Each structure stands twice: as structure tokens, then as C-alpha cells.
């Protein structure tokens, strides 16, 4: 249900974002609800980035385009907190809070694919 972004083997990421792909539909939990509940716990999240074909500039010029891959990715992505001095305890708090809100368990990693590749 929850997995990190897959990394390309021929590049090194900048790690400026920590994006999880979450199957909100399969879990029956709307992304906006997850964002709001995390915010109440002091955990800020965002959605990066709106697909180009859904941006007003491109819609106005090219009309509505159907790009199912981009739309599917966008519907599942959630950027989690990430900062240089983030401690293991902070990571645990974020992941345990996310798991609880999603109705999953994090302790055994059964529902979380924690491998980037």
C-alpha cells in the first residue's frame, strides 16, 4: 500500500523530497484527510508536483489531455517531512503516525515497502 519512489540505477538523487506512493483508493482513505490528520499531529506534508498537463497554462493552450500514467502517479504521491537534521525518532514518529492514520501497522513493515529499489 505504501512504497517509496523507485530510483533509477544510473543516477544519484538529490534527496530534496521524501515522496511516498500511497494507494489511497485501495486503503479507502482520501489523501486530503491524511494530510489534515498529519497536520493536526504537527506533521506537514505536501503534494509535489501537479502534472504539467493539469497546469492551467497548458490546459488553456492544449485543452484537456488524458495522461493516465502521470495522473495515476499524482493520485498516489505524498511528500513527507525531510530536513538535514532529521533524527531517527522524527522519522519513526512520521511513519508510525502515517501508518496509524492509514489503518496499517508499521512495526513489522508488512504494509510498507521500505526499499527504494
Name each model-derived stretch.
Residues 1-117:
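PLP-dependent aminotransferase class I/II
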